[in-house]
């Protein structure tokens, strides 16, 4: 076992320990607030728990550096700071079982001879060093290197600060760290962890780390629980003290499983020294056995009530160490069974190792309960019935010992080790519940078997459950348990019966679902048929419109144009929708699609129907973008395809309304831009840069009048988007009779050579072909040449603000750059939109600098 470093915390005089509020060990011991380890060390160690400590080498003890001497001794480990240790007078008549061996603790300043009994008391000799002295004045100074008084005792903070205790333990958990529970001492401990071994003398000093105490115990032969409590000195000082590491002997005596469990539990507990834990475990097991064998209470002076509740102390320590998972997962016995009172002896089960013969007994009980509890069937019922009994027994068993013992049963021992060794551990001998223990032993295999076979058939389960209650009755556990088993069995049978009903219900449910599905299919089929009928009606209506439009084409009316547009759009739609519609799954849909193909030119857009939208992902057919064309009213395909007029497909008003809403929004934007464009293009001068067009023959018809552009197709480079405007929009234009023949042409040239985009209902297709010429536009903010627009296009991120980069063109200029593309519309980037647009995520600081500085404007 690694020896505690010389700079171990020194148990200081009580005067020094005053630094912490309930510094006196008595106050500490009074309540579990004090780390149970230190208290238990002091108290439990009193009764020969120090046995075998007497022979511990002085070095070991000195490493503990228990300065029993009440005068504050500054341990070098304490960095010369004399921690004030609460003078703890342990009124534990510590039988000098190992008194013969007085250990001189070399607190670097004070070499105190600590009688092994004093050591047992908490490794703290009476200041007088009388091992036999019933009262031990524990003045623990944990020399945490710097933790002067704070290291007084891990327990020093224990009175009210379990966290501090735990943290002190954690610090002390490093063998070098001094386990002072006080936060200050914790900090100091952390600083001095390596300098000062954790002296869980806290039992005596109420601050010794459990591992420290374990190490010290291994030296002194005193066994300390994880809390540093003296579990028990070995019966003979020689047993522990015979070797500086009596733990080896203890190990031999200790159950291997116990050692393993102790080591396992100790390891999870914050960095507890495995060797220390093992030795402590050995000692603990030895001591526990010794207690059970001797049946002698550790010290009559130590009233269990005064002992810190190991449960609370451990809980606090676990809390501070984040050990709750360990507690809950590994064993709640850690709390409940911490103090094992066998034969009236007070045994503190190491919270860390949690492997103690008495604990094991409870663990076995718990384990028996636990396996049964997991099985939710009759076994589970048995488990609850059994669990209360062992708990009660344990409570009764220990209730005489301490109230804390009663509180201990709180853990259900869910994870208590169920090892047969622990079950049969002789130390378990507990007169209070031999029958229960025997029953558990007998029952355990059965319970585990049932637990293993939770999936057995109901009959088997019923049999097992019935057998289990029978066995319980034999064992005479509790009639209630047997009754509960019978009740459980009845429930199981009922469940079995109910299972059939449940299956019936399930089948019925499935049947209902199938029927509902069929009904849904039928309903869908009916809907599709209705859609097909409505499509047919729309088709007929479209044919009528087609006929009427063909008749009206001769008349120069916007209506004719609209009808021709509708016709062309229908034709295009038929072309586009024929293929996707054929994909529709419903036979009606296929039929309608076939019909659509038959009536291609006049077929209404199937896309407008919800079914078609479901059938294919492109409800709106692709739009043909044709270069500006000579107005040929008879060539409808030159027109941009248009969605049906609401009149053409009245049955699809809803879907059309969706399209129209979108298009109307686009149209509104587009129209506003056109108006602005017209206002900006206030004359031929402004438009002189536009691609050359034949002057409008009817230039005087109206400012925006349609001009005759026959034979003058605009070059595709300057072909402007042909977007379909709303009918109301087209009516806003003054149409000369001369240009009525041009109505089929969507793009109408104004007398000013500006292009007016007349749009009937339909998608707004905006193809902006920037002319190769460099027109100037007089914008509200700035006159911007088109050549400048290239940089602007490159600087799109400037004009498109992303959520990440708000737009800032220039502090003086609001973001209002209106670019009038020649002849088509003004592109007005007037909106600080934060939607992610092109290159939205791209940010060029230099570019932004240029922009902000207005360098790009300088180009103008």
UniProtKB/Swiss-Prot annotation:
<feature type="region of interest" description="Disordered">
    <location>
        <begin position="481"/>
        <end position="656"/>
    </location>
</feature>
<feature type="compositionally biased region" description="Basic and acidic residues">
    <location>
        <begin position="485"/>
        <end position="507"/>
    </location>
</feature>
<feature type="compositionally biased region" description="Polar residues">
    <location>
        <begin position="552"/>
        <end position="567"/>
    </location>
</feature>
<feature type="compositionally biased region" description="Basic and acidic residues">
    <location>
        <begin position="434"/>
        <end position="463"/>
    </location>
</feature>
<feature type="compositionally biased region" description="Polar residues">
    <location>
        <begin position="579"/>
        <end position="600"/>
    </location>
</feature>
<feature type="compositionally biased region" description="Polar residues">
    <location>
        <begin position="96"/>
        <end position="121"/>
    </location>
</feature>
<feature type="region of interest" description="Disordered">
    <location>
        <begin position="691"/>
        <end position="735"/>
    </location>
</feature>
<feature type="modified residue" description="Phosphoserine">
    <location>
        <position position="70"/>
    </location>
</feature>
<feature type="compositionally biased region" description="Acidic residues">
    <location>
        <begin position="326"/>
        <end position="339"/>
    </location>
</feature>
<feature type="compositionally biased region" description="Polar residues">
    <location>
        <begin position="704"/>
        <end position="714"/>
    </location>
</feature>
<feature type="compositionally biased region" description="Basic and acidic residues">
    <location>
        <begin position="516"/>
        <end position="546"/>
    </location>
</feature>
<feature type="compositionally biased region" description="Polar residues">
    <location>
        <begin position="364"/>
        <end position="383"/>
    </location>
</feature>
<feature type="region of interest" description="Disordered">
    <location>
        <begin position="1"/>
        <end position="31"/>
    </location>
</feature>
<feature type="modified residue" description="Phosphoserine">
    <location>
        <position position="309"/>
    </location>
</feature>
<feature type="compositionally biased region" description="Low complexity">
    <location>
        <begin position="69"/>
        <end position="83"/>
    </location>
</feature>
<protein>
    <recommendedName>
        <fullName>Uncharacterized protein C1604.12</fullName>
    </recommendedName>
</protein>
<feature type="region of interest" description="Disordered">
    <location>
        <begin position="265"/>
        <end position="339"/>
    </location>
</feature>
<feature type="compositionally biased region" description="Polar residues">
    <location>
        <begin position="51"/>
        <end position="63"/>
    </location>
</feature>
<feature type="region of interest" description="Disordered">
    <location>
        <begin position="46"/>
        <end position="192"/>
    </location>
</feature>
<feature type="modified residue" description="Phosphoserine">
    <location>
        <position position="603"/>
    </location>
</feature>
<feature type="compositionally biased region" description="Polar residues">
    <location>
        <begin position="627"/>
        <end position="650"/>
    </location>
</feature>
<feature type="modified residue" description="Phosphoserine">
    <location>
        <position position="555"/>
    </location>
</feature>
<feature type="compositionally biased region" description="Polar residues">
    <location>
        <begin position="173"/>
        <end position="192"/>
    </location>
</feature>
<feature type="modified residue" description="Phosphothreonine">
    <location>
        <position position="597"/>
    </location>
</feature>
<dbReference type="GO" id="GO:0005829">
    <property type="term" value="C:cytosol"/>
</dbReference>
<feature type="modified residue" description="Phosphoserine">
    <location>
        <position position="69"/>
    </location>
</feature>
<feature type="modified residue" description="Phosphoserine">
    <location>
        <position position="303"/>
    </location>
</feature>
<feature type="modified residue" description="Phosphoserine">
    <location>
        <position position="655"/>
    </location>
</feature>
<feature type="modified residue" description="Phosphoserine">
    <location>
        <position position="657"/>
    </location>
</feature>
<feature type="modified residue" description="Phosphoserine">
    <location>
        <position position="81"/>
    </location>
</feature>
<feature type="compositionally biased region" description="Basic and acidic residues">
    <location>
        <begin position="275"/>
        <end position="285"/>
    </location>
</feature>
<feature type="modified residue" description="Phosphoserine">
    <location>
        <position position="649"/>
    </location>
</feature>
<feature type="region of interest" description="Disordered">
    <location>
        <begin position="357"/>
        <end position="464"/>
    </location>
</feature>
<keyword id="KW-0597">Phosphoprotein</keyword>
<feature type="compositionally biased region" description="Polar residues">
    <location>
        <begin position="416"/>
        <end position="428"/>
    </location>
</feature>
<keyword id="KW-0963">Cytoplasm</keyword>
């Amino acid at each position: 076992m690694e020896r505690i470093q010389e700079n171990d915390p020194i148990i200081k005089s009580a005067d020094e320990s005053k630094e912490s509020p309930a510094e006196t060990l008595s106050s500490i011991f009074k309540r579990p607030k004090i780390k149970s380890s230190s208290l238990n060390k002091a108290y439990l160690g009193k009764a020969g728990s120090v046995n075998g400590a007497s022979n511990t080498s002085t070095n070991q003890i000195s490493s503990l550096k228990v300065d029993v001497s009440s005068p504050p001794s500054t341990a070098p480990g304490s960095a010369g700071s004399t921690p004030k240790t609460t003078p703890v007078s342990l009124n534990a008549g510590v039988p000098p079982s190992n008194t013969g061996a007085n250990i001189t603790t070399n607190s670097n300043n004070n070499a105190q001879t600590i009688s092994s009994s004093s050591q047992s008391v908490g490794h703290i000799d009476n200041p007088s060093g009388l091992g036999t002295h019933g009262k031990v004045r524990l003045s623990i100074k944990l020399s945490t290197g710097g933790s002067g008084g704070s290291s007084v005792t891990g327990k020093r903070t224990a009175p009210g600060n379990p966290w501090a205790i735990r943290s002190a333990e954690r610090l002390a958990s490093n063998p070098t760290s001094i386990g002072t529970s006080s936060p200050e001492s914790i900090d100091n401990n952390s600083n001095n962890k390596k300098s000062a071994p954790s002296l869980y003398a806290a039992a005596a000093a109420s601050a010794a780390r459990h591992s420290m105490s374990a190490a010290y115990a291994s030296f002194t032969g005193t066994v300390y629980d994880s809390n540093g409590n003296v579990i028990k000195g070995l019966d003979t000082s020689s047993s522990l003290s015979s070797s500086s590491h009596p733990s080896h002997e203890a190990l031999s005596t200790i159950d291997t499983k116990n050692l393993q469990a102790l080591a396992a539990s100790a390891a999870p507990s914050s960095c507890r020294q495995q060797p220390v834990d093992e030795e402590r475990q050995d000692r603990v097991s030895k001591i526990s056995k010794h207690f059970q064998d001797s049946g002698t209470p550790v010290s009559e002076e130590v009233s269990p009530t005064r002992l810190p509740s190991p449960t609370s102390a451990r809980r606090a320590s676990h809390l501070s160490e984040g050990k709750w998972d360990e507690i809950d997962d590994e064993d709640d016995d850690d709390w409940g069974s911490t103090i094992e009172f066998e034969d009236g002896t007070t045994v503190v089960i190491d919270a860390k190792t949690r492997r103690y013969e008495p604990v094991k007994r409870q663990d076995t009980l718990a384990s028996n309960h636990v396996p049964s509890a997991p099985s939710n069937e009759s076994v589970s019922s048995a488990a609850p019935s059994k669990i209360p009994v062992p708990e009660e027994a344990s409570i009764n068993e220990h209730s005489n010992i301490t109230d804390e013992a009663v509180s201990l049963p709180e853990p259900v021992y869910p994870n208590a080790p169920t090892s047969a060794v622990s079950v049969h551990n002789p130390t378990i001998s507990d007169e209070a519940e031999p029958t229960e223990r025997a029953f558990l032993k007998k029952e355990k295999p059965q319970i585990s078997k049932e637990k293993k076979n939770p999936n057995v058939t109901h009959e088997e389960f019923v049999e097992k459950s019935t057998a289990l209650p029978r066995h319980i009755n034999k064992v005479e556990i509790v009639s209630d348990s047997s009754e509960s088993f019978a009740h459980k069995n009845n429930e199981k049978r009922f469940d079995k019966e109910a299972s059939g009903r449940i299956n019936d219900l399930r089948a019925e449910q499935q049947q209902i679902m199938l029927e509902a599905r069929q009904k849904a299919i039928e309903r869908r089929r009916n809907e599709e048929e209705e859609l097909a009928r409505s499509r047919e009606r729309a088709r007929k209506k479209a044919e009528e419109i087609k006929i009427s439009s063909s008749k009206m084409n001769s008349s120069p009316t916007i209506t004719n144009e609209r009808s021709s547009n509708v016709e062309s759009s229908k034709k295009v739609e038929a072309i586009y929708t024929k293929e996707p519609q054929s994909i529709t799954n419903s036979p009606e849909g296929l039929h309608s699609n076939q019909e659509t193909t038959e009536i291609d030119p006049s077929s209404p857009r199937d896309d407008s129907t919800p079914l078609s939208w479901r059938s294919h992902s492109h409800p709106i057919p692709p739009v043909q973008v044709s270069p500006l064309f000579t107005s040929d009213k008879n060539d409808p395909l030159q027109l941009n395809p248009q969605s049906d007029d609401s009149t053409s497909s009245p049955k699809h008003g809803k879907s059309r309304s969706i399209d129209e809403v979108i298009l109307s929004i686009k149209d509104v934007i587009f129209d506003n831009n056109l108006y602005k464009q017209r206002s900006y293009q206030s004359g031929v001068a402004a438009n002189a840069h536009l691609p050359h067009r034949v002057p409008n023959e009817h230039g005087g018809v109206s400012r925006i009048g349609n001009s005759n552009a026959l034979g003058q197709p605009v070059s595709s480079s300057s072909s402007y988007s042909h977007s379909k405007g709303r009918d109301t929009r087209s009516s806003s234009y003054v149409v000369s009779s001369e240009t009525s023949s041009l109505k089929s042409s969507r793009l109408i040239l104004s007398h000013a050579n500006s292009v007016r985009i007349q749009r009937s209902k339909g998608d707004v297709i905006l193809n902006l072909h920037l002319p190769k010429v460099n027109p100037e536009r007089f914008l509200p903010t700035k006159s911007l040449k088109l050549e400048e627009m290239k940089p602007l296009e490159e600087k799109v991120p400037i004009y498109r603000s992303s959520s990440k980069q708000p737009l800032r063109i220039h502090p003086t200029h609001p973001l209002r750059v209106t670019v009038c593309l020649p002849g088509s519309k003004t592109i007005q980037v007037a909106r600080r939109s934060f939607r992610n647009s092109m290159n939205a995520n791209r940010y060029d600081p230099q570019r932004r600098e240029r922009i902000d500085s207005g360098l790009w404007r300088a180009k103008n």
